[in-house]
């Protein structure tokens, strides 16, 4: 097919959009691929839609290749299935909820575990029907608090979600592995650099969980890996390597000191090093206690205290993952006033446990470790408070930040931190949803068998932005051939009728050879056409200009920047050979 730019619904922009922060957002808007409608909501224009459809094609081919079957479920869903699974409340404010004219509750689907489980229950009733894997490529909806980066994090997005149903755990493991392998093929074909990391399951539930993260400095997900062992995990899933307990026999008794004006870790450390405690004190010697309130779905707010070494910040994502499915909030001034035993800046374990506040600590706070922490009175701290002797926490929690240089959980070396964008996620859900909906089928022995599920997602529209993020330069986009909106971009760079006729003929021959061609036949200057060819990002640009009269055309590689002249009579075969490798 030949796409003429003189007819194409396209308007390129020379300036970056004011709200764009990341390269992919800037370039996709400037190149006329997408347009913003509202925060987190975008229209796909012709060339952008082509790229999106190419990504969908690759995903479908690989899903079909593992025997998955495509169906399509509605995006508008009734409340009842999600209430049965508790996700009506677990999803919190991220769920788009609405009512029909009769007052019935509905939602716009974020994922479809419930509906797929019910669909299989309604259609299959025998072990002979299994295993089965179903998938869809569909628009999803999530009410993101801060949609950003264009189509990277939107409120409306295209996703491939698939669900496997097996009768045994071994079967689930096989389905999981098949999807994992398929995802590796998908991302390889799309030219995406990625890592696979261990992850948490969150509101999805289930056990085994891995994320596919595209390597990117602008990614919202932080992951760590150990170069010595290959261990890799999203920071939310990292398990802290706890030290061995220390015998506390013979340790000096804890002592309370007056520490005026020391409500922060920095001021406390400064005081300690001026107080002649017999050693140099760092923030790592202090115990910081964070107060939050938590609420289980449908429950009431309760106080929770979290103790971490003073040199560590609490990571909200890690804390949220550890508390899942409960939600949490920091305490307000009103909360402190209602609980006068909580003295801001001076909270210690003693008052927490005396008043029945659940107290969870970082795994590094093991028996025998000695700490400087609040004494529950303004302007006073306790020095030498020993875990296991002077206070006994209610348990541990993974909430402290993970840093590069921390020991790897497998003990093989140090962790290296990097950032990435989630492009895929695979879960072994188990029987969470088949239990909720009593999905039973007749087993081979005549007894009921409950299938076990896997859930597997790929961010299809997000992948368009990820590819743009990883494949661009200061001139514009550089699409991998697998997803490019065309195979060849032919530029008529001369107003001469002979050059125009030559370009038209070459484009027609390329079309007959089965290539997708963009032909820039606009009445615009060569400079404008060249800039647009670089911005649009088709991997091969063919310039038909002054050289045509001498029997030559110029072939430019958008990725390498290299250009070469080829004879006009051999241009067709050279271009086809280049495109098809």
From Swiss-Prot:
Keywords: Aminoacyl-tRNA synthetase, ATP-binding, Cytoplasm, Ligase, Nucleotide-binding, Protein biosynthesis. InterPro entries: aa-tRNA-synt_IIb, aa-tRNA-synth_II, aa-tRNA-synth_II/BPL/LPL, Anticodon-bd, Anticodon-bd_dom_sf, Pro-tRNA-ligase_IIa, Pro-tRNA-synth_IIa_bac-type, Pro-tRNA-Synthase_IIa_type1. It catalyses: tRNA(Pro) + L-proline + ATP = L-prolyl-tRNA(Pro) + AMP + diphosphate. It is found in: Cytoplasm. Belongs to the class-II aminoacyl-tRNA synthetase family. ProS type 1 subfamily. Consists of three domains: the N-terminal catalytic domain, the editing domain and the C-terminal anticodon-binding domain. Catalyzes the attachment of proline to tRNA(Pro) in a two-step reaction: proline is first activated by ATP to form Pro-AMP and then transferred to the acceptor end of tRNA(Pro). As ProRS can inadvertently accommodate and process non-cognate amino acids such as alanine and cysteine, to avoid such errors it has two additional distinct editing activities against alanine. One activity is designated as 'pretransfer' editing and involves the tRNA(Pro)-independent hydrolysis of activated Ala-AMP. This is Proline--tRNA ligase. The gene is proS.
